[in-house]
Amino acid sequence: MKVVYSDKHQLHDPQFFIVRGKVKRSNEQPERGARLLAAVQRDGHRIITPDDHGAAPRAAVHTPQYLRFLETAYARWRELPDASEEVVANVHPFPGQPCTYPDHIVGLAGYHMGDTACPIGAGTWEAATWSAHCATHAAQLVLDGERAAYALCRPPGHHAYVDRANGFCYLNNAAIAAQHLRTVHRRVAILDLDVHHLSLIHI
């Protein structure tokens, strides 16, 4: 089977995570991608590098505001005095609270980040973008006649919402692949093997 993989995932190296109130190093490390790559290589699968599929596949799933935030958040955050090395939200809007769309990076982080599992570092946007390219490329391989293709996506994407990072995820690769398949096929089935319901499948 063809396995679509980009070493750009190594640019995403999150450090910050909170577990039961304790700050810990994130489990979503570059070593995860390396282990998965080693496993598929050991089983004899063919590794291919994705093409750059442009912005359209992710724009078909995520809002322009959210994509702009992901692309610019790190640089804007680092302009703050005494800022941390990663973007981590510390304030969030809540149901019933009247609010307009924020313009300050602290407010934007709270608006677009659902938890502390998805800090944004210097390489997060590029890594997430190429992860989405992997998903799109694998979907295109199937459209081109492959019976199956595997996208080795890191950072993962299946818990990202249309306008919010969540659960280690930034761009929803499952939804991006499904939307790409829907450019040809009206209906696409998603089989979710995670331990709980993935986000953004009802699009």
Where are these regions (language model features)?
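HDAC/HDAC-like amidohydrolase catalytic core signature
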Residues: 1-191, 196-201
